[in-house]
Design a protein with these regions (language model features):
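Short S/T/G/P-rich N-terminal loop/turn motif that feeds into the first structured element of a domain
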Residues: 1-197
Length: 197
C-alpha cells in the first residue's frame, strides 16, 4: 500500500485592493512571474466583511524561492500597479491535511494561532471534531508555518454562519483552545472563495 501523497504547501498573501476587478486582471497577467518562482495559482478569496480584502493562495514548490520572490522589487512593483493599497501579510504554509472533495459551500473560516506543542494540540483538535461539525464547520486545511509547527493555520468550510460565529466567540472554544495549548488569542478571517484555478 502506498503512503498518501502530502498536500502541496501554500503561499498565502492577504492585502487590500482599490478595485477587485482591476486587480484580478493585473494578477492574472503576472502568472508567468509566479510560475518562474515555483508558484501556481490555486485560490482567490475575498473577505466576507470587506470584499476588497483579498487573499491569494498559491501552491508553492519551494519555500526559499517563494520567500525570495515575496521580497523582490518585481512583486512590489506588480502589486502597486495592480492597485494593492495595504502592506501584504505573507504566510508560508506546510500543509498537513487538505480535504479537496468538491463542496458547493462558498464561505470559509481561516483560524490562525500559536500553539505550545504541535502534537499535543493536534491530539486535542482531533478529539473535538464533532464539536466543529455541530457548529457548522468542516475541516478543510490543517497547516503550520514552514519551519515552525507552533504557528497553526486552519481552514473550515462554513455551512451555517450563525452557528460558526457563535462557536468562534464561545467560552467552550476558548476553554478547548486553552486545554490544547493555544498560546495567545486566535485570529479569525471569514471569506468567500472568489475563484479556483
Amino acid at each position: 500500500m502506498t503512503a498518501p501523497v502530502k498536500p502541496a504547501n501554500l503561499l498565502l498573501v492577504t492585502h487590500k485592493v482599490a478595485n477587485y476587478a482591476k486587480w484580478l486582471v493585473a494578477y492574472e497577467a503576472n502568472d508567468s512571474l509566479r510560475v518562474a518562482n515555483g508558484l501556481h495559482s490555486y485560490v482567490i478569496a475575498r473577505g466576507l466583511n470587506d470584499s476588497n480584502t483579498v487573499m491569494v493562495a498559491n501552491k508553492m514548490d519551494d519555500a526559499a524561492k517563494a520567500k525570495e520572490f515575496a521580497a523582490s522589487p518585481a512583486l512590489k512593483d506588480a502589486m502597486q500597479k495592480a492597485g494593492v493599497i495595504s502592506a501584504p501579510t505573507i504566510s508560508y504554509m506546510d500543509v498537513q491535511m487538505q480535504d479537496t472533495a468538491t463542496n458547493t459551500a462558498n464561505i470559509r473560516l481561516m483560524v490562525t494561532h500559536k500553539v505550545k506543542d504541535w502534537d499535543a494540540w493536534k491530539k486535542s483538535f482531533d478529539s473535538h471534531k464533532q464539536t466543529r461539525v455541530d457548529a457548522g464547520l468542516t475541516d478543510r486545511v490543517i497547516a503550520y508555518s514552514v519551519g515552525d509547527n507552533h504557528m497553526v493555520t486552519l481552514v473550515f468550510i462554513v455551512s451555517d454562519m450563525k452557528k460558526a460565529e457563535a462557536f468562534s466567540k464561545s467560552d467552550d472554544l476558548k476553554k478547548k483552545m486553552e486545554e490544547a495549548g493555544v498560546d495567545g488569542p486566535p485570529a479569525f478571517f471569514y471569506y468567500t472563495v472568489a475563484k479556483k484555478y
